[in-house]
């Protein structure tokens, strides 16, 4: 197909040679040339067309299957309409200005253009001080304006308020104050977007509970900006660790017909119920049913019940048995009606799978991973971590340094039960062999019994663990492990997977799980099965552990919890 454009007509497609990777835009607002120096890399010169021109401009045109003579046409089009896409240039960020060891002193005398949002504005006689933040770091850049600066009338008119977005040009000078080493002497300021006086986070401090109702604005605060940057660094460090260790990243599906945990706490995905833009008052009787009165899933989109995934583990195992070491990193969902500070309905999971590996290999990998990402954050997010150490959890840097440097301990589940039974402490939940450990038990072990060191508990009773975990020789326990850390409790859970077909089938039968639903998972044991192991890590709990934030709803951009799916 070839695209033909006329200034006064709509788009028309004709049956000619193919033009691929074709993009265009309309020049309709010449006043936007105010920002021309900032956008030169992507827009053609504004004076290329009359002010009222609606001519389309080709950014890129790549020909395919050109017939005889069509090459000349393309060359002609390029000369008449084409302009090359400009080079992408990274914007100068405040972190680059103030982030060095000298905190910006090496840039004194440089002319800069900074864009960001106004945090504070105060006037003193003939001088106005504006604090600007662009999200690249915790620090604001202090901008000093006098009445001779271009755009100062916007200060006098009240157009520049807290929350407004601005573009500021000026020169870096040594600061006369003591709070910062440098500041920007403003030569020109442009209000990019005004901020209404109803802006809800103008106060210096607002509660985190209030900010959860303003999740679209809370990243502009110091706390949530710092959380977002640390979360980003943890995600980057996660990929970096596994990639450097020879793992292959695998995208696991979000929609699945399998229940990895066998708990049944899944969100159903169906088209049998009217969508939001349709009549939501449709009777439940309209849902198709079988002769027996059950839902007729054969008429649903997938022809069978489908759910949002609770884990990417089973899918990860399929690739581990081909690529050896893999990991998944993506969203998972649990329809668990737990309205607590520790639970989310939607959260992210990191799930590596190691082929030709046992539980010892699994524990070693989990330990190396946690120490790597913790150290990476301490080395690369120093300003944000100092903020958390001052305002969120005093001593968090020391605590994390211990995790990064000290050896982890391991003990059996049976030994952990013995420690809890001997503890001079009253627990809310009972302690008994065969019962799962609760958060209060886990925190006692890591915080009190072992003085704040991470502890790995292994070899749990098989009755409290999932079907896929490898049965130990005693017939009562499985090769499973949980990593416990201070303040959180369980951070990582993993196991050696059951690679023996007959044992896995027997376990499915024992738990009355439908083997037909796991036919492909069983196939992995039929065709070249190998010992393999893996673990799962709730990413939000990791962010909590590293930042000291006590509520999990405050470490994910848009928390999904019971009765709450706003934004």
From Swiss-Prot:
InterPro entries (alphabetical): Aa-tRNA-synt_II, aa-tRNA-synth_II, aa-tRNA-synth_II/BPL/LPL, Asn-tRNA-ligase, Asp/Asn-tRNA-synth_IIb, NA-bd_OB-fold, NA-bd_OB_tRNA
Record carries keyword ATP-binding: yes
E.C. number: 6.1.1.22
Biological processes, Gene Ontology terms: asparaginyl-tRNA aminoacylation; plant ovule development
GO cellular component terms listed in the entry, alphabetical order: chloroplast; chloroplast stroma; mitochondrion
Effect of a null allele: Lethal. In heterozygous plants, aborted ovules.
CDD domains with a match to the protein in the record: AsxRS_core, EcAsnRS_like_N
Keywords from the named record: Aminoacyl-tRNA synthetase, ATP-binding, Chloroplast, DNA-binding, Ligase, Mitochondrion, Nucleotide-binding, Plastid, Protein biosynthesis, Transit peptide
Main location class: plastid
Catalytic activity entry: tRNA(Asn) + L-asparagine + ATP = L-asparaginyl-tRNA(Asn) + AMP + diphosphate + H(+)
Feature: DNA-binding region: 113-191
Key word Chloroplast present: yes
GO molecular function, one term: DNA binding
Pfam families listed in its UniProt record: tRNA-synt_2, tRNA_anti-codon
Protein location: Plastid, Chloroplast; Mitochondrion
Top class in the EC scheme: ligase
Stated family: Belongs to the class-II aminoacyl-tRNA synthetase family.
Cross-referenced PANTHER family: ASPARAGINE--TRNA LIGASE, MITOCHONDRIAL-RELATED, ASPARTYL/LYSYL-TRNA SYNTHETASE
Protein name: Asparagine--tRNA ligase, chloroplastic/mitochondrial
The species this protein was found in: Arabidopsis thaliana
Lineage summary: Eukaryota, Viridiplantae, Streptophyta, Embryophyta, Tracheophyta
Gene behind the chain: SYNO
């Amino acid at each position: 197909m070839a695209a033909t454009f006329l200034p006064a007509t709509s788009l028309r497609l004709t049956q000619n040679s193919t033009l691929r990777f074709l993009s265009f835009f309309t020049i309709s607002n010449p006043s936007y040339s105010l920002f021309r120096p900032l956008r030169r890399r992507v827009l053609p010169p504004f004076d290329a067309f009359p002010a009222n021109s609606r001519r389309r401009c080709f950014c890129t045109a790549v020909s395919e299957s050109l017939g005889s003579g069509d090459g000349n046409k393309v060359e002609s089009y390029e000369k008449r309409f084409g302009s090359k896409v400009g080079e992408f240039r990274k914007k100068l960020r405040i972190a680059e200005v103030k982030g060095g060891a000298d905190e910006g002193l090496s840039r004194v005398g440089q002319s800069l253009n900074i864009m960001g949002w106004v945090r504070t504005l105060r006037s003193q006689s003939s001088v106005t001080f504006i604090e600007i933040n662009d999200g690249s770091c915790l620090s604001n850049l202090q901008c000093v304006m006098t009445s001779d600066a271009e755009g100062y009338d916007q200060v006098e008119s009240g157009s520049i308020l807290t929350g407004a977005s601005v573009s500021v040009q000026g020169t870096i000078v040594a600061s006369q104050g003591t709070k910062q080493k440098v500041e920007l002497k403003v030569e020109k300021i442009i209000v990019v977007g005004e901020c209404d006086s109803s802006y809800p986070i103008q106060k210096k401090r607002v509660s985190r509970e209030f900010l959860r109702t303003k999740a679209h604005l809370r990243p502009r605060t110091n706390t949530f900006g710092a959380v977002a940057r640390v979360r980003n660094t943890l995600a980057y460090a996660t990929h970096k660790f596994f990639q450097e260790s020879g793992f292959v990243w695998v995208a696991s599906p979000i929609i699945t017909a399998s229940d990895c945990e066998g708990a049944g706490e899944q969100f159903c995905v169906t088209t049998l119920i009217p969508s939001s833009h349709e009549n939501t008052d449709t009777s439940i009787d309209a849902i198709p049913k079988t002769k027996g009165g059950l839902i007729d899933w054969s008429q649903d989109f997938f022809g069978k019940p489908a759910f949002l995934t609770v884990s990417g583990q089973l899918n990860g195992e399929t690739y581990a048995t081909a690529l050896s070491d893999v990991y998944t990193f993506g969203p998972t969902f649990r329809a668990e009606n737990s309205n607590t500070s520790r639970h989310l309905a939607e959260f992210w999971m990191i799930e590596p799978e190691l082929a030709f590996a046992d539980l010892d290999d699994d524990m070693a990998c989990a330990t190396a991973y946690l120490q790597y990402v913790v150290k990476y954050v301490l080395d690369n997010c120093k300003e944000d971590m100092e903020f958390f150490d001052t305002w969120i959890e005093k001593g968090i840097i020391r605590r994390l340094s211990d995790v990064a440097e000290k050896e982890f301990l391991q003990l059996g589940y049976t030994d952990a039960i013995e420690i809890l039974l001997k503890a001079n402490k009253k627990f809310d939940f009972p302690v008994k062999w065969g019962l799962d450990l609760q958060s209060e038990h886990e925190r006692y072990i890591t915080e009190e019994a072992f003085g704040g060191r991470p502890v790995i508990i292994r070899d749990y009773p098989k009755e409290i663990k999932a079907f896929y975990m490898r049965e130990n020789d005693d017939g009562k326990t499985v090769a499973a492990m949980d990593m416990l850390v201070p303040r959180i409790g369980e951070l990582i859970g993993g196991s050696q997977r059951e690679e023996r077909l007959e044992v896995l089938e027997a376990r499915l039968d024992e738990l009355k799980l439908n083997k037909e639903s796991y036919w492909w998972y069983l196939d992995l044991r039929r065709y070249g099965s190998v010992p393999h192991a893996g673990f799962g890590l709730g990413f939000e709990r990791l962010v909590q552990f590293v930042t000291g934030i006590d509520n999990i709803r405050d470490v994910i951009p848009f928390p999904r919890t019971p009765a709450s799916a706003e934004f």
